[in-house]
Amino acid sequence: MGVVTVPESNKQSVAAKRAFRPSSSIRHTPQWPVSDVTSDLTIEVGSATFSLHKFPLVSRSGRIRKLVLESKDTNLNLAAVPGGSESFELAAKFCYGVGVQYNSSNIAALRCVAHYLEMTEDLSEKNLEARTEAYLKDSIFNDISNSITVLHSCERLLPVAEEINLVGRLVNAIAVNACKEQLASGLLKLDQSFSCGVPETAKPCDWWGRSLPILKLDFFQRVLSAMKSKGLNHDIISDILMSYARKSLQIIREPNLVKSDSDLQRKQRIVLEAVVGLLPTQANKSSIPISFLSSLLKTAIGSGTSVSCRSDLERRISHLLDQAILEDILIPANIGAMYDTDSVQRIFSMFLNLDECEYRDDDDDEEDAVDESEMAMYDFEGAESPKQSSIFKVSKLMDSYLAEVALDSSLPPSKFIALAELLPDHARVVCDGLYRAVDIFLKVHPHMKDSERYRLCKTVSCKKLSQDASSHAAQNERLPVQIAVQVLFYEQTRLKNAMTSGGGTGGSNQSQFFLFPNRSGSGMASGAISPRDNYASVRRENRELRLEVARMRMRLTDLEKDHVSMKRDFVKPQSRRRRYGMLRKLSRGLNKLNAIVLRFRSSQSVASSGKKHTEEKTNSERRFMFQKRRCHSVS
């Protein structure tokens, strides 16, 4: 027989018992041809030994011919054959005239072996090199799926595959065919737009994009770079990158396993940095979801990637911050606190620093088609403008984030204060969410410095608190005294404005009804009461409200005096018992003021119930109540 292949452990040379009889035609059989000529050449390839004949090999292989002439030895060692013993066996069968079946799995190895053994047309017509080249051009380069398979097989054939430019040609073929698929898909969609009821086809990459993740990182990078240079759609590139990242980044699936293996963590870090470097440059216009970018950032921080890689991800997330949810920005920290607030602070800062032109880029192509009158009615800085609505969404996201990280007892107050102070004042319409987060932080961190406590509470705009939040803040003992006084002041100002807008001529009845919609039993809401009675009822209610405002103003004056005296006392050294006594004293004063507010609300309900009293009786009763409360006021 012509060849014997054995493992290295049992390596032995067995001579052919029959000689080789040349054949002018190639036999389409995988078996070796029977020959009566004894083998006269032994070739070792890796762990296998081949007992062959010189004539069929030297007639087609230039390298074997040179080795036989130079060494004049019957034993040759070809340890550097691309593809190992399996590839050499196929090449040897080709030399013996045995038909070799080409496919996408072995064509790259055969092409590299033909180059290594120098099986060119100079030695024999239709040699292995020419035949493999013809198969590549006819069946591989024009099919994107086959090109990916062959390129994957080239990973174990380096550097020979690079020397013959097989890798470069395959990369270019994949990129060109991908662009052709994109063009064909676009033309098909255009054709379908003229017909009705025809479903849209899938994306061009749906059937071959899943094959790209089998490539190693360097080949994958070259393919994606070639696709970008050929003009492939960024959405398709994004889909390919997301598929590759999910299959290649094990840290996303098993973070604990990766952290325990330093070598695996290093490899994952290299893959992650490469994926981030291949992301489309226009992140704000790409189809990459923010959840994917967030997972990459969490992985980057956990695996210790470069600063530039993390900064790039933070910048991309900032462009899509108005689409984020709380889970997207809850980034775990490696050491110290539970969450990485520094990264989140940089993301929000970059969002605020975005140029206004970036918000208007999406509308540049549509401005010519929009009527000028409609554009004149559109206020870019209004509450419904894209920029302002995005800021409102981001402010709600920030409040939710602050409420979550406030539960971390190891978070330094300075970092929490920096986050609370980050957004501008116009970003929030109502500060209830921020107040809730601040209150949680004060409860979890009871030993804060007074200066830090006051600075943190200053971030809450008291005039933007709702009525319920103001009532809670007025009785909140964790807030500094100055903040509590501000809350009461703005609450009194709010009531004063309500009274001012409610008084006046009959033309203000409509606004007064809007301010007090619950008074359905009053003369304004009743159509059976005459205009004269209605006017008298309104005047009576106005007088009652003015009296209540006057009482609250006097009570507020007393509280301000208490505040001034307390500030003077705090400057001097004093015992903790005395300080707590003053706080309790002020708390009792605030509770009494809250009782005044409740009586004020009850007076409204009494006025709306239709009870009619004479002005003399009402004034005397009110005066008596006022004098009684003054006797119990806090000095």
Swiss-Prot record:
Question: Residue ranges of region Disordered?
Answer: 604-635
Domain NPH3 per the UniProt entry, residue ranges:
206-494
- Domain BTB, by residue range, is 39-104
Query: Where are the disulfide bridges?
Result: none
Regions of biased composition (Basic residues) lie at: 625-635
Determine the domain of life of the protein's source. Answer: Eukaryota
Q: Where is the composition biased (Basic and acidic residues)?
A: 612-624
Q: Which family does it belong to?
A: Belongs to the NPH3 family.
What is the UniProt domain comment for this protein? Answer: The BTB/POZ domain mediates the interaction with some component of ubiquitin ligase complexes.
- What does the function comment of this entry state? May act as a substrate-specific adapter of an E3 ubiquitin-protein ligase complex (CUL3-RBX1-BTB) which mediates the ubiquitination and subsequent proteasomal degradation of target proteins.
Q: Know the name of this protein?
A: BTB/POZ domain-containing protein SETH6
